[in-house]
A protein has these predicted regions:
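Extended, intrinsically disordered, low-complexity segments
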Residues: 244-261
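Short coil-to-beta-strand
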Residues: 30-37, 103-108, 146
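Hydrophobic alpha-helical segments and helix pairs
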Residues: 81-124
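Domain-core and long-helix interface of multi-subunit machines
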Residues: 13, 106-213
Length: 261
């Protein structure tokens, strides 16, 4: 049996639709060895319905620690999905460093004051090539910051199906090389299949680049409801095997190890 994990799961502590307990049975049924919760944390912005108020960090961690002690058939890992903002690295570090987390996912949602997944209207009237360049620059900065263990949906800018005219291979190559240099993992995020894009992040046409650069990988669902835990995982694992990946990144107390799959 393959050792499978799903580290990108959202509960009602941020924008998920259920309490953490509701995700356990579906995770076990999906054959997961570990499930990790990673609530949205957006510092430097006013709390919104989709992200967790920082004052709730302690209750969130305590809740999951209790759940972990009470559940025996699956390992429960505690994480966060943290928005990256260039120039705020030191403040982010000071906030995160004392927390007893197993991993931290770094994500770029914001370009300016708006998130790239707010709706297709964000892209209207804008130069798509420039947007893609700015987005990848932000992700590169997140990778190089040293703050994160995993980079989440590294090309979320694709969410509504917009495509630049420029060749994207150099952007993906630069991203993969930077991930390898800074020893950061990337995720195959299967939730893109549920968005207008209707495919995984990152773009499957460029996944080979991450393999060629030997970047550690994990498969995550980005589930916001229990029925989407480990969704499309068989397809994702088959795709990774086809490309030549043979190991998966797993995390415990911010330490990564690789397990075969």
């Amino acid at each position: 049996m393959i050792y499978k994990t799903d580290y990108h799961v959202h509960s009602s502590y941020s924008d998920g639709r259920s309490v953490p307990e509701d995700y356990i049975t579906p995770a076990i049924a999906a054959g997961l060895s570990e499930i990790g919760f990673s609530e949205h944390l957006t510092l430097f912005k006013d709390p919104e319905v989709w992200n967790m108020n920082p004052v709730n960090i302690s209750p969130y961690i305590s809740h999951l620690e209790t759940l972990r002690n009470n559940v025996k058939n699956i390992k429960i890992k505690i994480g966060l999905e943290v928005d990256f903002f260039a120039g705020k690295e030191e403040e982010i570090y000071r906030f995160l460093h004392p927390l007893p987390l197993d991993y931290i996912i770094g994500s770029v949602h914001y370009l300016g004051e708006k998130t790239v997944d707010v709706g297709p209207e964000f892209y209207e009237g804008k130069i798509i090539d420039r947007l893609f360049g700015s987005y990848f620059d932000s992700v590169l900065a997140a990778v190089a910051s040293g703050l994160f263990d995993i980079i989440g949906h590294c090309d979320l800018i694709r969410i509504y199906g917009y495509k630049p005219s420029a060749d994207l291979e150099p952007l993906y190559r630069s991203l993969a090389k930077t991930m390898k240099i800074h020893d950061v993992a990337f995720e195959v995020n299967t939730n893109g299949r549920n968005r207008p894009l209707a495919d995984f992040y990152p773009d499957r046409h460029y996944l080979r680049i991450f393999r060629e650069e030997n970047v550690p990988v994990c498969v995550n669902s980005d589930a916001h409801m229990p029925l989407r835990v480990a969704q499309y995982f068989d397809e994702a694992y088959d795709l990774l095997r086809y490309i030549g990946f043979t190991e998966m990144a797993v995390f415990d107390k911010r330490v990564r190890k690789m397990v075969p799959f």
